[in-house]
Amino acid sequence: MAGGKSPKGMFAARKLRLKRLKFRWHQRKFKRRMLKLKEKFDPLEGAPMARGVVLEKVGIESRQPNSAVRKAVRVQLVKNGRIVTAFVPGDGGVNFIDEHDEVVIAGIGGTLGRSMGDLPGVRYKVIMVNGVSLDALYKGKKQKPVR
């Protein structure tokens, strides 16, 4: 374990530990966590979900080699006023959403909190509309309340 410049003596534990702590700053995850970079730059401010108001419906062209228009919505977050694009999952899901509806968005589940699959630049997905889950609306278990 000890490298060429590492102390190898019987009482070298403190020195080895301090050296390890210093080199942790070269690790990307450690640096992001310690400097709280996610909370600073993430529109959701580190939270798993956020509430927002739908501004418009948009169609996003998928990346190569696929060819499709994926349905999404532009959402203005209540907590900080930032505008993000959120994917609407499911077949015909965008029909349940109108402008000025209140939606809850969550991360889409891409690597390192980034976009997923063939959706360029979309990091979030819609999970609730006006307090009713999108899943319940699909299955016909509940109807969307009129605001």
Curated annotation (Swiss-Prot):
Alphabetic keyword roster: Ribonucleoprotein, Ribosomal protein, RNA-binding, rRNA-binding
A single GO cellular-component term on record: small ribosomal subunit
A Pfam family the protein falls into: Ribosom_S12_S23
Gene Ontology terms describing biological process: translation
CDD domains: Ribosomal_S23 (cd03367)
Molecular function (Gene Ontology), one example: rRNA binding
Oligomer and partners: Part of the 30S ribosomal subunit.
HAMAP family for the chain: Ribosomal_uS12_A
Family per record: Belongs to the universal ribosomal protein uS12 family.
Function, as annotated: With S4 and S5 plays an important role in translational accuracy. Located at the interface of the 30S and 50S subunits.
PANTHER family from the UniProt entry: 30S RIBOSOMAL PROTEIN S12 FAMILY MEMBER
Name of protein: Small ribosomal subunit protein uS12
Protein species of origin: Sulfurisphaera tokodaii (strain DSM 16993 / JCM 10545 / NBRC 100140 / 7) (Sulfolobus tokodaii)
